[in-house]
């Protein structure tokens, strides 16, 4: 049986039957071997794919949903601005995070590092495995859109859907609902931050690229 892996954040983490990830896998007759990790940075995505590559477990289909640049990497914790403190975690970690955002953080540095690292991953890593896996790349968040900027980053390995899933969900495209979806991130009625109709629409969109 074919395999498919989703690499990214919470926009490709939903395991419900109505999730676009599950719908797409069913249409491809593929077993899901990797899921997105909610709240994680692009560095978590890089490390996840490097692990499957190292152990020669690259799936037949690899779908990447790239998140925003403003998340810090930690191998166990979600760390970004306004991260909720967990009671079992050493509070010094969150104190250090708060200090980082106040005294050390630089948006331009984040954006430059994001652009360079993502292009390197696209041009050097993914291009080297494109004969082993069908690749689709898209945006969970279009780069820097949460900061009000929209640089033109083009990705060349595999199929590139140059659309923001965040914006797709927020604008209610493909949904019967009349109310805005985001930024109600904790709405339990949503899957991958989208309605059931939107999940179906997104599964169709990705399937069309993979079947073309």
Regions found by a protein language model. Give the residues of each.
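Alpha-helical cap/lid subdomain in secreted, periplasmic
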Residues: 50-200, 204-212
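Serine-esterase "nucleophile elbow" of acetyl-processing enzymes
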Residues: 1-46, 54, 195, 201
């Amino acid at each position: 049986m074919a395999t498919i892996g989703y690499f990214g954040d919470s926009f490709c983490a939903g395991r419900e039957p109505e999730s676009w990830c599950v719908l797409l896998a069913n249409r491809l007759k593929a077993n899901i071997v990797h899921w997105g990790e909610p709240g994680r940075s692009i560095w978590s995505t890089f490390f996840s794919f490097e692990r499957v590559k190292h152990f020669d477990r690259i799936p037949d289909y690899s779908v990447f949903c790239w998140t925003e640049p403003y998340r810090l990497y930690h191998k166990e914790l979600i760390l970004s601005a306004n991260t909720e403190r967990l009671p079992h975690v050493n509070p010094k970690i969150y104190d250090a995070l708060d200090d980082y955002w106040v005294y050390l953080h630089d948006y331009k540095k984040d954006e430059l590092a994001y652009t360079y690292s993502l292009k390197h991953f696209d041009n050097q890593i993914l291009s080297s495995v494109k004969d082993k896996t069908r690749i689709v790349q898209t945006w969970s968040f279009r780069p820097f859109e949460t900061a009000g900027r929209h640089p033109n980053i083009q990705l060349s390995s595999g199929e590139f859907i140059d659309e923001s899933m965040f914006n797709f969900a927020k604008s209610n495209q493909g949904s019967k609902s009349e109310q805005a979806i985001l930024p109600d991130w904790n709405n339990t009625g949503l899957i991958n931050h989208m309605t059931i109709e939107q999940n179906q629409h997104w599964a169709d969109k990705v399937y069309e690229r993979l079947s073309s």
